[in-house]
Amino acid sequence: MRWPRGAICVLAAALAARAAGADLGQLQQLVQDCTACGLCQGRRHAVFGMGAQPARWMVVGEAPGEQEDRQGLPFVGRSGKLLDAMLQSVGMSRERDVFIANVIKCRPPGNRNPKPEEIAACSPYLRRQIALLNPERILVLGRFAAQTLLNTEATIGNLRGRVHSLQTDEGRSIPVVVSYHPAYLLRSPAEKARAWQDLLLAARG
């Protein structure tokens, strides 16, 4: 079933109101209990995120995969190991410096792209995470995550290589750098050199 645009806007507004006054612990509970879209029906775990609090960097991926859904943690398995190595190459670690989250908190079936109503259900949680963590900068990994966070349809090739700005609900401007998702880099290792350039840009930013 395709949701009407008006219904999606109402859903997003209602969830944003619920998330607005929550601290991180309360927000995590809201995510774990969320039944706002159909993704809740097939999940093992809602993946809230993990890492440093407060965080110098926030890393935002797309959605949990099979391993993340099973363990309830973001970026595990081969993609997680590559992400950790990427962060360590610029002196960062997920335990000390970085909080890692996804745009979508529950795994879409077959790792398909999320539907508009699923994005509407999860976006208020991510925006509240950003507000509470107040990172110095955000590293966004993957086309879908970048397009969602920056509200654009531009390709990742057009988005990477420069610093963007995210305006928070509190009026702050946070630098955003876009790069490739680690899963893509595992399939296309020739792009790792460009991902390294993106990391250096984020570290300078």
Walk through the language-model features, giving the residues of each.
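A polyanion-binding, active-site-adjacent surface
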Residues: 1-205
